[in-house]
Amino acid sequence: MQQTPLFKNHYFHQLPGFYTALQPTPLHGARLLYHSEGLASELGLSSDWFTPEQDDVWSGTRLLPGMEPLAQVYSGHQFGSWAGQLGDGRGILLGEQQLADGRSMDWHLKGAGLTPYSRMGDGRAVLRSAIREFLASEAMHHLGIPTTRALTIVTSQHPVQREQEEKGAMLLRVAESHVRFGHFEHFYYRREPEKVRQLVEYVIARHWPQWENDERRYELWFGDVVERTARLITHWQAVGFSHGVMNTDNMSILGLTIDYGPYGFLDAYQPDFICNHSDHRGRYAFDNQPAVGLWNLHRLGQALSGLMDTDTLERALARYEPALMQHYGTLMRAKLGLFTASPDDNDVLVGLLRLMQKEGSDYTRTFRLLADSEKQASRSPLRDEFIDRAAFDSWFATYRQRLMQEDQDDEERRRLMNATNPKYILRNYLAQMAIERAESDDTSALARLHQALCRPFDEQPDSHDLAALPPDWGKHLEISCSS
């Protein structure tokens, strides 16, 4: 029996003046193209919800009981400069689904049409960008990285003009909250300190209720936001993920990865990798992400300066670097198969990364193959991946000595490393092939890639081709902010 999900909209009722209430604008010929069965199950939605009879739900044409759609207003810094009001220019928060375990989840429809905050945009999304966000959301979730999720992709016959004409689409994004750093900045720069305070109180009550009545709640909360952001970015660095557009309006207050645009996972290890071809100065290059994260937190701290004094803000911000280093060290040791800490661990890691950078070694493949090394063997199967084998042998001798300090035998260490180092990541060329097929209404490549990304650490013998290195045409795909 099909059970209708229960909705409320706390944001609608508790934060008047923070949004505009409005309905989604229909897309011509809209229909459900694809959905996440795993997320649907987590949300308690049966397969009956994903039949053609329900297309009007996923396109926002038919609202479910309790939905009260609205467009949130927020501002932000783009590429280091204050940009003023930025959105939400094409996304509508439909409502908050109330789950059986007591949590609530935003249903946010991206590409839902013009809002009062659209500026020069058309309020639409294209199928290409919807598929890229869907796949990235699923990939990151199954890699264990905090992220928004994506439930459905809707395609249409509605033409949308970008660099060329493309199919209009909608994506239903699911998250515990869509509040961004830019929400707080918006009211700070409008000189509305009471609204900043109101938003902070709302967020604490909804997501940090343990501190709701604590006199130090602002400091405790902001310190936790700082640490969540640090941990998120260490996850990105460890898995080789480059976000591409770390503007303050693209930073989640919950420490989730949000707004997948011109992102990319590292192929060859290239610390200064720039995935966004609009980022001409490399502000959001892969190796600059930790520094940008802290810069963005300083902008958030500035927006909160009416609630906390300078010493309190600086105390909270000072938690960033220790959290970053501690968490990054833990994640990277695990990638190396080191489960205790030693003073020399950073030298072992840096030695391998330098070799990889020098030779352009594939980031994901190198760490995955490293698990097949044995303590007692003088050579590693990974050796054949390097041209300068003498340099690799020198590094491997140091690595073997470090492995001797670990308690795990080779089989146990291999198992633990393979549960940390994925075999399957979302390479841009794989996404592009799935997009091209889906634009012709063939979702078979999308489904196959999605299924592999849901089990990134498993061998999956039938999917080995999806772990292949990019072909020449797929090595330098240019991805822009256009979506």
UniProtKB/Swiss-Prot annotation:
Catalytic residues in the record: 249
Broad enzyme group: transferase
Catalytically driven reaction(s): L-seryl-[protein] + ATP = 3-O-(5'-adenylyl)-L-seryl-[protein] + diphosphate; L-threonyl-[protein] + ATP = 3-O-(5'-adenylyl)-L-threonyl-[protein] + diphosphate; L-tyrosyl-[protein] + ATP = O-(5'-adenylyl)-L-tyrosyl-[protein] + diphosphate; L-histidyl-[protein] + UTP = N(tele)-(5'-uridylyl)-L-histidyl-[protein] + diphosphate
Keyword ATP-binding among record annotations: yes
GO molecular function: AMPylase activity; ATP binding; magnesium ion binding
One Pfam family recorded for the sequence: SelO
Co-factor requirement: Mg(2+); Mn(2+)
Enzyme Commission number: 2.7.7.-, 2.7.7.108
Keywords, alphabetical: ATP-binding, Magnesium, Manganese, Metal-binding, Nucleotide-binding, Nucleotidyltransferase, Transferase
Signal sequence coordinates: none
Coiled-coil ranges per UniProt: none
Record-listed ATP binding positions: 87, 89-90, 110, 122-123, 173, 180, 259
Binding residue positions for Mg(2+): 250, 259
InterPro entries found in the cross-reference section: SelO (IPR003846)
Function text: Nucleotidyltransferase involved in the post-translational modification of proteins. It can catalyze the addition of adenosine monophosphate (AMP) or uridine monophosphate (UMP) to a protein, resulting in modifications known as AMPylation and UMPylation.
Family recorded in the similarity comment: Belongs to the SELO family.
Name this polypeptide is given: Protein nucleotidyltransferase YdiU
